[in-house]
């Protein structure tokens, strides 16, 4: 296929047009008075959203050179979303400002490489200063503030704060679509895995169709159990203690299953069997997790352990176990807290090393189950369109909150970037490097300017006043007042602000140092579209 090439100023201008088209569509959503954008969907109703990355991903421009510019800025939003989970609109606004200011200077004869070095120097100082003014997040109230700002909804803020309080910072919080109109929180405390009882005769509560074991022993093995002879020694010891037994095995079948069911029905003793969760190596790891959580051991022939020689000392214990048709939940395992902590740290180390998204998800689940539990936020709304929009907002809020817990918070509403303005301005640089620093200074004014414009105010006036205010004081666009941003609960996660700035600078530097752009030549339609006369045919 033939290619078309544009060089230097012509190439950069074409890309800038694409950058502007995408950024102008995204930046109308910034701030408390930001508007929505409606996205056409090939199937189903249109999607209404104010999520920067969702809008950026939808934009495809006809001109291939403009499209390249748009795609580069979409990459800024996407990368920021991957790292911090929020701040995609801020990143887009920063990137547009840096590219626009940079191209003006390149057109005036500045050296792009010098500008690039200046941008990198300024961003490095800005990131250090953001870390210096960052405050650690404390308590449920702070978490609720971060979530409420991101979702623009106080009720959502409270829900997320409660979820994080219940399952801990490492807990898994998932979003599901609710059948009703309201958004509510459902928390599963303890460790839950998706395997239920192997026989319905094992249930203890016929109304709820579940087996509830109070203070049970837990036998954990990776073997298939079919002979009752293997289980007899340990069963006799458990019966003497007068406590129920949960058996987690690859499978329980045949004579062993029949004996357990008959004794349960006769009331001799209460035992429930469930299949081991997961497959292959993941199954071994999950069984080991359960063993550590409950203070038991995995009975495995690989480790030289046999079922018939198992004693009560090798069994795990828990305050309560609830087994349904599809799930098993272990509450308050009796494991040693130091061993559980060590296991959590081991999984965290694996999380940092893994490159697979699937493995990361599974490790995160295991971590959550050991650390506290799983919370499900069931998102409700009156219409499907509202439901999708609300779910996206809550997802952003959740990511934002996690980022805040990780790296702390700074004043929101673009104020934090303005608070570090003077430190960046004090960087010693000469020539084109100094120009690069000035480009970053102009860009860090842009979020405040845009938030003010979206609120129907003159951005430049707000920016100038902010430069002279003492640190932490900012403009609350929702009320039109000047307040202490952190006290007023208007905060941004440091990680979100930092990632937005770093990713915007990275892509801006790439665009400024572009000297040629190559794209496919559009194919002309050679076919003759005029249909021949049908000659009077019916």
From Swiss-Prot:
Record's GO cellular component terms: cytoplasm
What InterPro entries has UniProt attached to this entry? Chaperonin_Cpn60_CS, Cpn60/GroEL, Cpn60/GroEL/TCP-1, GroEL-like_apical_dom_sf, GROEL-like_equatorial_sf, TCP-1-like_intermed_sf
UniProt-recorded name of the protein: Chaperonin GroEL
Q: Where does ATP bind?
A: 29-32, 86-90, 413, 476-478, 492
User: What family classification does the UniProt entry report for this protein?
Assistant: Belongs to the chaperonin (HSP60) family.
What PANTHER family does the annotation carry? Answer: 60 KDA HEAT SHOCK PROTEIN, MITOCHONDRIAL
Superkingdom is Bacteria
Keyword Membrane assigned to the entry: answer is: no
Give the gene name: groEL
| Enzyme Commission no | 5.6.1.7
What reaction does this enzyme carry out catalytically? ATP + H2O + a folded polypeptide = ADP + phosphate + an unfolded polypeptide
Q: Which GO terms describe its biological process?
A: protein refolding
What's one Pfam family the UniProt record gives for this protein?
A: Cpn60_TCP1
Q: Which UniProt keywords apply?
A: ATP-binding, Chaperone, Cytoplasm, Isomerase, Nucleotide-binding
| Task of the protein | Together with its co-chaperonin GroES, plays an essential role in assisting protein folding. The GroEL-GroES system forms a nano-cage that allows encapsulation of the non-native substrate proteins and provides a physical environment optimized to promote and accelerate protein folding.
Compartment annotation: Cytoplasm
Q: Could you describe the subunit structure of this protein?
A: Forms a cylinder of 14 subunits composed of two heptameric rings stacked back-to-back. Interacts with the co-chaperonin GroES.
- The secretion signal range is none
Q: Which organism is it from?
A: Geobacillus kaustophilus (strain HTA426)
Report the GO molecular function annotations.
ATP binding; ATP-dependent protein folding chaperone; isomerase activity; unfolded protein binding
């Amino acid at each position: 296929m033939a290619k078309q090439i544009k060089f230097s100023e012509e190439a950069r201008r074409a890309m800038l047009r694409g950058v502007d088209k995408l950024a102008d569509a995204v930046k109308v959503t910034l701030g408390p008075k930001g508007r929505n954008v409606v996205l056409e969907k090939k199937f189903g109703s249109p999607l209404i959203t104010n999520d920067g990355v969702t809008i950026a991903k939808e934009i495809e421009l006809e001109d291939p050179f403009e499209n390249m510019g748009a795609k580069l800025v979409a990459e800024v939003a996407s990368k920021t979303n991957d790292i911090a989970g929020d701040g995609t609109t801020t990143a887009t606004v920063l990137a547009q400002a840096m590219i626009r200011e940079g191209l003006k200077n390149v057109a005036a004869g500045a050296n792009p490489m010098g500008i690039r070095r200046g941008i990198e120097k300024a961003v490095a100082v800005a990131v250090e200063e953001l870390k210096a003014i960052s405050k650690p997040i404390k308590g449920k109230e702070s978490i609720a503030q971060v979530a409420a700002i991101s979702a623009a909804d106080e009720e959502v803020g409270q829900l997320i704060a409660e979820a994080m309080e219940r399952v801990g910072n490492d807990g898994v919080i998932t979003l599901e679509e609710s059948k009703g109109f309201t958004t509510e929180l459902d928390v599963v405390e303890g460790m839950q895995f998706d395997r239920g009882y192997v026989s319905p005769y094992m249930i203890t509560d016929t109304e709820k169709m579940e087996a509830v074991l109070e203070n049970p022993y837990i036998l954990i093995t990776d073997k298939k159990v079919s002979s009752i002879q293997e289980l007899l020694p340990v069963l006799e010891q458990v019966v003497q203690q007068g406590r129920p037994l949960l058996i987690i095995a690859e499978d329980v079948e045949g004579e062993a299953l029949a004996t357990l069911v008959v004794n349960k029905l006769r009331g001799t003793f209460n035992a429930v069997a469930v299949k081991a969760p997961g497959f292959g190596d993941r199954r071994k790891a999950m069984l080991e997790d359960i063993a550590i959580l409950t203070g038991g051991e995995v009975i495995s022939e690989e480790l030289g352990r046999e079922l018939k020689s198992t004693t009560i000392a090798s069994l795990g214990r828990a305050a309560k176990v609830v087994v349904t048709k599809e799930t098993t939940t272990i509450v308050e395992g009796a494991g040693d807290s130091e061993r559980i902590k060590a296991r959590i740290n081991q999984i965290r180390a694996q999380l940092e090393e893994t490159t697979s998204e699937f493995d990361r998800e599974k490790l995160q689940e295991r971590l959550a189950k050991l650390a506290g539990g799983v919370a499900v936020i069931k998102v409700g709304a009156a219409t499907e369109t509202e439901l999708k929009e609300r779910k996206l907002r809550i997802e952003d809020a959740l990511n934002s909150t996690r980022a805040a817990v990780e790296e702390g918070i700074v004043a929101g509403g673009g104020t934090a970037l303005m608070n570090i303005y003077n430190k960046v301005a004090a960087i010693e640089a000469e020539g084109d490097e100094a120009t690069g620093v000035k480009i970053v200074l102009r860009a860090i004014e842009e979020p405040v300017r845009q938030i003010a414009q979206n609120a129907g105010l003159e951005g430049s006036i707000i920016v100038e006043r902010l430069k002279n205010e003492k640190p932490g004081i900012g403009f609350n666009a929702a009320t039109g007042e000047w307040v202490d941003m952190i006290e007023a609960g208007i905060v941004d996660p440091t990680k979100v602000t930092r990632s937005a700035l770093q990713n915007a600078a990275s892509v801006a530097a790439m665009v400024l140092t572009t000297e040629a752009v190559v794209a496919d030549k559009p194919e002309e339609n050679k076919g003759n579209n005029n249909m021949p006369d049908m000659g009077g045919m019916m």
